[in-house]
From Swiss-Prot:
It comes from Escherichia coli. May contribute to the conjugative processing of DNA. It has a functional relationship with Psi (plasmid-mediated sos inhibition) proteins. Disulfide bonds: none annotated. Residues 114-175 are annotated as: Disordered. It holds the Pfam family SSB. One of its GO terms (cellular component) is nucleoid. The keyword Ribonucleoprotein does not apply. This is Plasmid-derived single-stranded DNA-binding protein. Residues 6-110 form the SSB domain. Residues 115-136 have a biased composition (Low complexity). Keywords: DNA replication, DNA-binding, Plasmid. Gene3D superfamilies: Nucleic acid-binding proteins (2.40.50.140). NCBIfam families: PRK13732.1, ssb. Residues 163-175 have a biased composition (Acidic residues). The gene is ssb.
Length: 175
């Protein structure tokens, strides 16, 4: 690999609103998300707890965009892996800039936990080995597949890896 640098963003946060999905002329899906990440700390002078929230614009493409539009809702917790991009445009003679996290087919969008307003029937499977179970986690070995390999048309509110589904991985290690 002859990369001159690394451009990788990892976020774990909650959606500020429902995803906005649109389709571009070639038929591909594009979803826009607003993801909030927060950090909290104790103020050394006052002893009060403080919190700072950052809002991130996330753009998903392809099947990931379709899955986000179908299953993600405001308040849902998500894990995002993508690339940071800044684009510019002209707005009546004023150059405007926006920085976004792009999640292409090589990126990852993983649903974590459940949204606060969901009922008990839509709860995810419990965590195993500290890893949340989602459509990106395979049954064997906890190996992770890329988001583009997920199946978008699953009837459950939050898709889970079907029991017994074979992804072509073997438990036999050749060494």
């Amino acid at each position: 690999m002859s990369a001159r640098g690394i451009n990788k963003v990892i976020l774990v946060g909650r959606l500020g609103n429902d995803p906005e999905v649109r389709y571009i002329p070639n038929g591909g899906a594009v979803a826009n998300l607003q993801v909030a990440t927060s950090e909290s700390w104790r103020d050394k002078q006052t002893g009060e707890m403080r919190e700072q929230t950052e809002w991130h614009r996330v753009v998903l493409f392809g099947k990931l965009a379709e899955v986000a539009g179908e299953y993600l809702r405001k308040g849902a917790q998500v894990y995002i892996e993508g690339q940071l991009r800044t684009r510019s445009w002209d707005d009546n003679g004023i150059t405007r800039y926006i920085t976004e996290i792009l999640v292409k087919t090589t990126g990852t969008m993983q649903m974590l936990g459940s949204a606060p307003q969901q009922n008990a029937q839509a709860q995810p499977k419990p965590q195993q080995n500290g890893q949340p179970q989602s459509a990106d986690a395979t049954k064997k070995g906890g190996a992770k597949t890329k988001g583009r390999e997920r199946k978008a048309a699953q009837p459950e509110p939050q898709p889970q890896t079907p029991e017994g589904e074979d992804y072509g991985f073997s438990d036999d290690i050749p060494f």
